[in-house]
Amino acid sequence: MSESGTLTNKESDTKILSVLVSDPQKQKTHSQTYITYQVSTKIDGKDEPNCVVRRYNDFVLLHQILINDHPALLVPPLPDKKVLNYLSGDRFSHSFTQKRCRSLQTFMRRLLSHSELSKSRILETFLTSTDWDVYRRSLTGQISTSEVSDVLINAFKHVNRQRDEFVEIKEKSEKLDHNLSHLDKLFHKSVKRVDLIGQNLKKLQSSLSGLQELCCDEKELSNSIKAFNDGTMQLIDSLNDLNKYVDYEYNVDIKDMINYIEALKQLIRLKDQKQIDYEELSEYLTRSINEKNNLLSGYGSGNYFKSKLEELAGINQEMARRDKIAKLETRVQSLTDEVEKSKQVADEFEKEVLKEVEQFEQIKTLELKDSLAALAQKHIDFYDDMVEKWSKIEERLESA
Amino acid sequence: MNVFDGSDEEDNNPFSGTTHLYASGIAAVTDGPDDYDFTEPSINGSSDENAQSNAVAEPIEETDEPAEEIDDDTLQTWRFASAELSRSSAFETSYTNLLGQGKNPEVIRIVDAGQYRDIYGKYAIGYKIEFGGIVVTRRYSEFDSLRQSLCRLLPTIIIPPIPSKHPIIKYLFNPLHAKKDIKIIERRQRLLSRFLNNCHKVREIRNHIVFQKFLNPEYFWKEVLNTPPISILPMNNLLAPPLNPTKPSPIHLLLPTPTVLTMRKHEQLIGRNDVMEIKFADYDSDLIRYKAILQPLNKTVRSIRSNIQTYSAVLSELGAYFNAFSLENSVFQVSALFEQMNRLSMGIEKTGQAIDVNYVSAEIFSEAIMISLEEGSKEMLQFIHEAQRVLHFRNFKQEQFYTIETTIKKRKDRIRELKEADLQAVRLGEALKLNAEESPTVAQVMDSMTRKSANKNHTDKQIMGLFRSSASPNNKSGSDSISSEVEPHLLTKDERVVQVNKLEKELEKLNECFKLIEKDLQQVNESMDNSLNNLEKYFHEKWFLIFRELAHNITSWLKDCSESWKNAKQSIDSI
């Protein structure tokens, strides 16, 4: 129970260095089947990584708590639920769990790279504590997920005035999204093609084996065919590995990046929401003040008929007017306060979001760098390995 | 040579009415048909017939004007410059010089392909062939007719293949156009050049006058097609000397003409345990096995190539999007990250460049696969098809051989039967004579028998005459007419004598045929064995070449890609 010790002592500053999500395992209980992932955390000052086992729903819970606790922060998104895969029963397939594992890993890394979220206590519990199970049981179903409807309501309202930065951010994130989704599509296509090429090469290989059998009297030729075929075999295998990497990891990274941008957009929409609140309030305030001023300056409120009607009804116009002015007075008073408050909230939020955008940029840059570097490295490894092998084969064939 | 003596027909020249060299009788042709060096005047006599038969064979060419009427200005200058002035000239010397270089893989090159104006002023796609410094332009249809002619001139030789014809329907809607169909023309250029070099490697083709004339700009190809030896090719190569079908040989015309229906089964022939037979049966089955491997291989290679092409198209798009991505990869300019983000842009751009390099080298690689493996295996398949055609010719020759052999056996049996019957009749006659001395009844029967036979003899003469004319020498196999099937003891003595005489005469001719076909078969075997052996060697060399080329291309593709990714990595690492 040493973990719970660190939990209670929050100031002890357990510095988390890195997190690894790995080893998806299929679990079967009497009522359900699910996949668990091993989450191992390297903590400063400890040699052994700290390992816990979590399932996707645990990640969902963590995510939900973080969003509710930090509405103004950019909480990294989780991979989609992929309802279709659930329906088709594909969610236990190797490729599905591998890809999800990769996404969860990215999620954890983003949390840890975030200056605020990485300090969150709930994250620490999630990573290190055996108490998490208790947490989950008591919290599941209790957390509201209301923000979605808010966003929907205001989907057609637009902010009137906004800072230039946000105009830029919105525009650019659209473009980035656009580029990335094209990359995603193209990588998918290329993965499919390479897969086909691999299958074709296998067929070629078997044809050549047939040829080798036919030419077995010709020692040299048969040796050449064998050399070539061996090389083809290795090419197929390595190509397959490389393709798997692109499919399972690089492509997932792109997808996750797209989701991250989506989360950022969501956050900006939330900011817009606050702005809209403020703008609506201040508009209301202006209207009230105008009305009050009109009354004060003696120009009849409303039209002639209305005043006539009121006169007939025996209402003292002068009295009513004063009454109204007094009401407006208090309304203006309270509205002024409200506007002040909402402006503060909106400004605060805006500042917060700008900071978040900066953080996003930082995390994104690092992430892109890492995934590009890994992509390049995988390719270099593949090509170098193949160059070495095929140079030898070429030599063998030349000497034949 | 007097096979026809004793026959009552006056003109049994089978060549009459054809364009054969012997059309006007054997005497009309001087000896020495071994060399094809016919001079032009020698064909003047039959040129009218040639013109007619060619008009039938090539109706398309009919509209063309004769070469002589063409204005010199319309001729391609580089083709016919001073050609007519010196017809013997430089070509022959350079050709003979180059003959020694048969080993050199690329003696003949097609240096250019494209639209040109042929001698009739028509536009066509021409292939500029360069051989020993001499250039000649030929069209695809001319290559095609060269090949067809070679197939007929050298029935025992495997003639190298040419690229298949453009599908006729495609051609109707969309004729080959120099600018539009660069790919097809390039491909043809490559494959036709391969064809010429493959031909040049084969001694029989290399030394053949028709092939030499094809490479010689001094000859109009149409003219070559209308002159010997092509114009005097026999209708049926089975009735001509196999190594040299245009060489006159009347006995060949006596050979039977087997059809596919009368062909013996292979197994029957192998049953004879002939060494050659077994060897050729092996060739046959090897070819079939080879084909069974090459066909799916060719298909697979085609789909590899097209998949790599699609893949490279995806890569090119991917490269473009990485480029766009490098310009628009941030949502907000953070001053603190300015430097880093610039570098990120660089890194992404370099990655895009690496992908671009991958795209280009994949394109090159797919081209290399197409040229070496796809076209190579296709060529081999065509070669196998050719080899099977040649083997088929041999089967027919073989069938001729067996037909004659069995016919001789039948005739001999018949003669023996007849002679035995004779002896028996003598014995029977003697026995009867003895009996007749004792019994008048027997004597009476004998008397009527001799009278009957005398009558029969008379009618038989008519039958015999009919038989003679109907059983003309060239269908020996069908000459078992009714009278020869009759039980020998039912014939009279005279009839038997006549038949024996006739059969012996036939046998004489048959034996001559047998000697001939035996020699033919030996020649066919030898020549084909050689040709098939060469093919096998050629295949082996081709495979070595293909594997070497492929391995080389794979390595350079891998190297290029590796290099480009290393460049990208450097830039990424500096982020």
UniProtKB/Swiss-Prot annotation, chain A:
Residues 15-134 form the PX domain. GO terms for molecular function: phosphatidylinositol-3-phosphate binding. Residues 319-356 form a coiled coil. Pfam families: PX. GO terms for biological process: autophagy of mitochondrion; endocytic recycling; piecemeal microautophagy of the nucleus; protein transport; reticulophagy. It is found in: Cytoplasm, Cytosol; Preautophagosomal structure membrane; Endosome membrane. Sorting nexin, involved in the separation or division of vacuoles throughout the entire life cycle of the cells. Involved in retrieval of late-Golgi SNAREs from post-Golgi endosomes to the trans-Golgi network, for cytoplasm to vacuole transport (Cvt), and autophagy of large cargos including mitophagy, pexophagy and glycophagy. This is Sorting nexin-4. It comes from Kluyveromyces lactis (strain ATCC 8585 / CBS 2359 / DSM 70799 / NBRC 1267 / NRRL Y-1140 / WM37).
UniProtKB/Swiss-Prot annotation, chain B:
Residues 30-66, 467-486 are annotated as: Disordered. May be required for cytoplasm to vacuole transport (Cvt) and pexophagy. SMART domains: PX. Pfam families: PX (PF00787). It is a peripheral membrane protein. The keyword 4Fe-4S does not apply. The gene is SNX41. It comes from the Eukaryota. Belongs to the sorting nexin family. Keywords: Autophagy, Endosome, Lipid-binding, Membrane, Protein transport, Transport. The keyword Transport applies. It is found in: Endosome membrane; Endomembrane system. This is Sorting nexin-41. Residues 41-55, 469-484 have a biased composition (Polar residues). GO terms for biological process: autophagy; protein transport; retrograde transport, endosome to Golgi. The PX domain binds phosphatidylinositol 3-phosphate which is necessary for peripheral membrane localization to the perivacuolar punctate structures. Gene3D superfamilies: Arfaptin homology (AH) domain/BAR domain, Phox-like domain. One of its GO terms (molecular function) is phosphatidylinositol-3-phosphate binding. The lineage of its organism: Eukaryota, Fungi, Dikarya, Ascomycota, Saccharomycotina.
